[in-house]
Curated annotation (Swiss-Prot):
Name this protein carries in UniProt: UvrABC system protein C
Organism whose genome encodes this protein: Trichlorobacter lovleyi (strain ATCC BAA-1151 / DSM 17278 / SZ)
Intrachain disulfide bonds: none
Lineage: Bacteria, Pseudomonadati, Thermodesulfobacteriota, Desulfuromonadia, Geobacterales
GO molecular function: DNA binding; excinuclease ABC activity
Family (UniProt): Belongs to the UvrC family.
GIY-YIG domain segment(s): 12-90
Gene Ontology process terms (BP): nucleotide-excision repair; SOS response
Subcellular location, principal: cytoplasm
């Protein structure tokens, strides 16, 4: 029976379908309100999208799973896409970490902290912010207006007197009873209203408090409310309002045959607070693509706003609304604006997506030219899309480490960066260290997982190249990657001339005595140098971390009163020696057995 004929027996119920090729590999996962109708559409002559043609030319079988509701189909589809990562489904690249402000209102004297992830823990989260510095700047602004505590409560209660922030007016010192719990909670409510964009409620409430304090002849309290109102007014002057309060995310979508871009504008409290763009590939239908994006993006412990403004309507819109509302714990709306300010915001998000896609396409074309030129200049058997570079870092044979970095299509592929702690080679045995690193990278298990790179770059001249080739030969690989070495430029002459000249960087190839000389300003050489320098940076960073860790560990044990047990307690509390080093005296003093005096010795 032909595949087209088998579709006639599909049910008309909601569910999920999986398309497989002749090897059984899942090519695409989709959901449907009506399985038979949805899958039949792929065989229609009217669908001329290239992605659909490419997909259907490879599909040899289609399976389905019936679900009770469309929402269940939505959730199952999301699970299967994450599990199998099919080639023709949306594949997003999101290397950006967002930050939020968190406050637990059930805590005694609540305080705001900057966090990386939004957890379902009952606390309030505000954001997201594109960087830690942006989140901290908002927090500093908030603390100037609302003098809430800065430190963990245990640290505050262990202090003998109020902290420095109290002295400069940025902490109300609740730990020393310099403010009542009721007054402190009013400050917390004000800070929350400010972050929610409910500035009219905030200002009117504080003005009423100031008036009541003045009428009751509590002039110091009235002055505090007055100063607080001035700080709020000053801040609000610099905020541009784009909507009538509330939190919204505005999505814009742009795509071509090869890739797509989705822009997200963040409106918090009625003000545009930031934006991000995610790039990806795959996806057959714009409605399905946007629905998949929403599941990926907001299901990954993100802040969920009150509403999402979309450039198009979604077939699974109602199911997505229910799912988002369950995650948030309150109603979330999906809207496709038709007119007015909200439509203008969606158009702005779409223009951001289009601009990002155009920039990405131009960059991609430049990278393709660079890789093609590199292949031609170095006589490589194939286009060097995946390039790996390895470096060794050691100091007189101590703390020896290796590093491996990977570039994919001219850009860092940090998921495949690896650090290697040298365990077997001793002393200054660079050959042995490289052999140990390559034995781990090019083990059968790792080759099966990652495959071979198109090109391996090593730092050095012909000697380093020959050593690398010998190591690879000893590993007995059935297939070997292409290998070149890149020798750094050197200062010409004795270096005493005021006009310093340098030799060219040279690329050594196997079986060739003289190096290839690339123009110093050429894109291929810049790419090779960037990869080599990144491997060196990565190795040096790891080497220094190990060296500093041992130095700090030795220094800790030399402090009177710090033994192995207390060292373990400190490591448990702060996670690492770096964490101990970065902790404040007050935070160190929260560890059992650490007095204020000992904490100061540790910080000294």
């Amino acid at each position: 029976m032909e595949l087209r004929d088998s579709i006639r027996s599909f049910p008309t119920a909601p569910g999920v379908y999986l398309m497989r090729d002749a090897t059984g590999t899942i090519l695409y996962v989709g959901k449907a309100r009506n399985l038979r109708q949805r899958v039949s559409n792929y065989f229609g002559a009217t669908d001329g999208r290239p992605q659909v043609r490419f997909l259907m030319a490879r599909v040899t079988s289609i399976e389905f799973t019936i679900t009770d509701t469309e929402k269940e189909a939505l959730l199952l589809e999301n699970t299967l896409i994450k599990q199998h990562q099919p080639r023709y489904n949306l594949n997003l690249k999101d290397d950006k970490t967002f930050f939020s402000l968190r406050i637990d209102l059930t805590e005694r004297f609540p305080r705001f902290t900057v966090v990386r992830k939004v957890s379902r823990d009952g606390a309030r989260y505000f954001g997201p912010y594109a960087s830690a510095s942006a989140a901290r700047e908002v927090l500093r602004q908030l603390q100037r207006m609302f003098p809430l505590r800065h430190y963990p409560l245990k640290t505050c209660l262990n202090r003998s007197r109020p902290c420095l922030y109290h002295q400069i007016g940025q902490c109300s010192a609740p730990c020393h009873n310099l403010i009542t719990a009721e007054e402190y909670n009013l400050l917390v409510e004000g800070a929350v209203l400010f972050l929610e964009g409910k500035n009219k409620d905030l200002v009117s409430g504080f003005r009423q408090r100031m008036k009541e304090a003045a009428e009751g002849l509590h002039y110091e309290e009235a002055a505090r409310w007055r100063d607080l109102l001035k700080a709020i007014d000053t801040t609000l002057e610099h905020q541009k309002m784009v909507s009538q309060g509330g939190d919204s995310d505005i999505l814009g979508l742009a795509g071509n045959e090869d890739s797509l871009a989705i822009a997200v504008l963040f409106v918090r409290g009625g003000s545009l607070s930031g934006s991000t763009v995610l790039h990806g590939s795959g996806g057959l239908d714009t409605s399905d693509t946007l629905a998949t994006f929403i599941q990926y993006y907001y299901g990954n412990e993100r802040f969920i706003p009150d509403e999402l403004l979309l450039p198009l309507s979604l077939d699974a819109g109602q199911s997505l609304e229910e799912w988002l509302s369950e995650l948030k714990g309150k109603k979330v709306r999906l809207q496709q604006p038709k007119r007015g300010d909200k439509l203008n915001l969606v158009n702005l998000a779409t223009r951001n997506a289009q601009a990002a896609l155009a920039e990405k396409s131009a960059t991609r074309q430049g990278i393709e030219r660079t890789l093609a030129e590199l292949q031609q200049k170095l006589a490589l058997p194939r286009l060097p899309r995946r390039i790996e570079c390895y470096d060794i870092s050691t100091l007189q044979g101590r703390h020896s480490v290796g590093s491996g970095v990977a570039f994919l299509d001219g850009l860092p592929d940090k998921e495949r960066y690896r650090r290697y702690r040298i365990r077997e080679s001793q002393g200054q045995d660079d050959f042995g260290m490289l052999q140990e690193v390559f034995a781990r990278r090019f083990s059968p298990e790792r080759i099966e997982q990652w495959g071979l790179p198109d090109l391996v770059v090593v730092d050095g001249g012909i000697g380093q190249l020959n050593s690398t080739l010998s190591v690879l030969a000893e590993l007995g690989l059935s297939e070997r990657p292409a290998v070149v070495s890149l020798a750094k430029s050197r200062v010409k002459g004795d270096g005493k001339d005021i006009h310093v000249e340098r030799t060219e960087e040279r690329v050594f190839l196997p079986g060739r005595r003289n190096p290839v000389r690339l123009r110093q300003d050429s894109a291929p050489l810049k790419l090779l140098a960037a990869i080599r320098d990144e491997a060196h940076r990565f190795a040096i960073g790891y080497h220094r971390r190990l060296r500093d860790r041992e130095t700090l560990r030795s220094a800790l044990r030399e402090i009177p009163g710090v033994g192995p047990k207390l060292e373990r307690l400190l490591l448990t509390r702060f996670g690492s020696l770096e964490g101990i080093q970065n902790a404040t005296v007050e935070e160190l003093a929260t560890v059992a057995g650490v007095s204020q005096e000992l904490a100061r010795l540790i910080k000294a």
